[in-house]
From Swiss-Prot:
PROSITE patterns named in the record: ATP_GRASP, SUCCINYL_COA_LIG_3
Reactions mediated catalytically: succinate + ATP + CoA = succinyl-CoA + ADP + phosphate; GTP + succinate + CoA = succinyl-CoA + GDP + phosphate
Residue sites binding substrate per the record: N268, G325, I326, V327
SUPFAM superfamilies (alphabetical): Glutathione synthetase ATP-binding domain-like, Succinyl-CoA synthetase domains
Protein name stated in the entry: Succinate--CoA ligase [ADP-forming] subunit beta
Pathway noted in the entry: Carbohydrate metabolism; tricarboxylic acid cycle; succinate from succinyl-CoA (ligase route): step 1/1
Binding site for ATP: K50, G57, R58, G59, E103, M106, E111
One BP term from GO: succinyl-CoA metabolic process
Species per Swiss-Prot/TrEMBL record: Chlorobium limicola (strain DSM 245 / NBRC 103803 / 6330)
Keywords: ATP-binding, Ligase, Magnesium, Metal-binding, Nucleotide-binding, Tricarboxylic acid cycle
């Protein structure tokens, strides 16, 4: 689960991570009041007005601007709120701005990158620091790997002081700046672990000319599987920033990711779902979604899955690919029949069922009187999907 920058900073601040003073605003008047308060309290010559969306690249897209007065902050807010911000991460459709973060300006000396995430290749958390602050870390790793330091963290011992010092030394910091950076990195790691985050990224981490070390931007992603331990964080979810189909699917405990193809997929199991999408692509089609109905698929979840798939107007055919291990194929078949009759499926539906009660399921489909295309194996299913698309 992703959250906004200002929400992430509020959480990090509780763990001792230094962040600039900021106030969230939902209207131009609130932005003016926030700026006035910051000018009076902080004595900064400028404030920064930042669009709050779940995407990076806001600065280049005009979503981060300086204001030298409360009135200027209000005018910037008028322009930003309700506008659609298009960045390299939003796609061409962009994201609408509904809230702003008004923040004190910083007297920046240097910018760095600090991030913590899980390295799945080693099954360990990894601390990453770079001297190239403000840039995409993937680009830095590819083009200038010598400017990126990765430190593997032993899960039994956690981040050690010498590792935090190694990171600060790599950034070329000395004296008070060095000590502040070490404190910052340790606090960030403690926050990352305590809140069960999957990513804690500070880009940029800034060092001011006064020696302060602060998170100028913060991106926090939560591990969705651990949210049951942090139910208060669920209140931070902004569904307006998410795909509406994915939000609807989550209500039925369906794992759904929308893609830009024309073949709807309904599968049980993430591995089988990815293999199914690969086969569709190889056969000449394009998957329209990733939809995993899970191991406990019921007629109701299958019906809900069809509704979500059909809400995508780009879908021209549907492939149901179920391997009945935990789930019984006859229950899935019942859901397909129920959905077809209730919703009125008017698209080609190719069905491949293997495993527990597959014969019973196939008989149910054959006797349903519905126009469902049976497939024998994954290759055959993908081929029949392509034939259905070609036919029209």
């Amino acid at each position: 689960m992703n959250i906004h920058e200002y929400q992430g900073k509020d959480i990090l601040k509780k763990f001792g991570v230094s962040v600039p003073r900021g106030i969230v605003a939902f209207s131009p008047d609130e932005a003016k009041q926030a700026a006035q308060q910051l000018f009076e309290e902080q004595g900064s010559p400028v404030v920064v007005v930042k669009a709050q969306i779940h995407a990076g690249g806001r600065g280049k897209a005009g979503g981060v601007k300086l204001a030298k007065s409360p009135d200027e902050a209000m005018e910037i807010a008028r322009q930003m709120l309700g506008a659609t911000l298009v960045t390299h991460q939003t796609g061409p459709e962009g994201k609408q701005v509904s809230r702003l973060l008004v923040e004190e300006g910083m007297n920046i000396d240097r910018e760095f990158y600090v991030g913590i995430t899980l390295d799945r290749s080693t099954s360990r958390n990894v601390l990453m620091v770079s001297t190239e602050g403000g840039m995409e870390i993937e680009k830095v790793a590819e083009e200038t790997p010598d400017k990126l330091l990765k430190i593997q963290v032993d899960p039994l011992y956690g981040l050690q002081g010498f590792q935090a010092r190694e990171a600060a030394f790599f950034l070329g910091l000395e004296g008070e700046q060095f000590r502040n950076a070490v404190t910052f990195i340790i606090a960030l790691y403690n926050a990352y672990m305590t809140i069960d985050a999957s990513l804690a990224e500070i880009n940029p981490l800034v060092v001011t000319k006064e020696g302060r070390v602060l998170a100028l931007d913060a991106k926090i992603n939560f591990d969705g599987n651990a949210l049951f331990r942090h139910k208060n964080f669920l209140e931070l979810r902004d569904t307006n920033e998410e795909d509406p189909f994915e939000v609807e699917a989550s209500k039925s405990n369906l794992n759904y990711v929308r893609l830009d193809g024309n073949v709807g997929c309904m599968v049980n199991g993430a591995g089988l779902a990815m293999a199914t999408m690969d086969m569709i692509q190889l056969a000449g089609g394009r998957p329209a979604n990733f939809l995993d109905v899970g191991g406990g698929a019921s007629p109701e979840t299958v019906e809900e899955g069809f509704k979500i798939i059909l809400s995508d107007k780009n879908v021209r055919a549907i492939l149901v690919n179920i391997f009945g291990g935990i789930v019984r194929c006859d229950r899935v078949a019942g859901g397909i029949i129920q959905a077809a009759r209730k919703i009125g499926l008017n698209l080609p539906v190719i069905v491949r069922l293997e495993g527990t009660n597959a014969e019973i399921a196939q008989k149910m489909l054959d006797e349903s009187g519905l126009n469902l295309i049976a497939a024998n194996g994954l290759h055959d299913a993908a081929a029949k999907v392509n034939q259905a698309l070609a036919a029209g």
